[in-house]
Amino acid sequence: MADQVLSRTLNQKFDTVFEEVTHQETLNLLNRNDLKLFCLDIETNQFNYDPLVEFLEDNLGMYVFSRAELDELVDAGKDRTVALKAVRRLIKTGNPGEKGTGSELGEILDYCFFEHVLEAPKILSKYEQVTAGGTYKAQSEGVHLLSVGKAGAPAYQLVYLSLIHIS
């Protein structure tokens, strides 16, 4: 992979929370593709959610705040309160899990998977899109920068995730 022009924001504890499921399945598409499946750790026949909760607490601020906002918080000595400030912002935007506000668990997990699995740094999270300019109509779950070039020949693609809810 080519050198990254943008660093990833995700705390690198991903592999302690999610385990990749090995399989032989493919999507049978013409273009290069990968199908990756992950699951949480299982203890006594039940999912262990504690590591997931801790992982999300550690990364919530990175999802909610832009890099510039995070830098401002660190410079002001507020780096220990980033997660609390992130929770407060999410609550202001809408009820936890409310569709379209950027506070749904799936939207936050999308950010985590894009950053870790694709190694595609966040440009804008769903939450940042939703709150930018006061608009609440973001159709993308996030915008990430994917490196597709080789060493010495950098190339990048913008990656969007858009989900269609069918009732």
List where the protein language model places each region:
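A short mid-domain helix/strand-loop element embedded in enzyme catalytic domains
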Residues: 76-88, 152-154
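A structured, charge-rich N-terminal accessory region that forms the first stable segment of a protein
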Residues: 2-82
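A generic fold-level signal
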Residues: 32, 135-137, 153
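Extended, Lys/Arg-enriched charged tracts that mediate electrostatic binding to polyanionic substrates
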Residues: 101, 105-138, 144-147
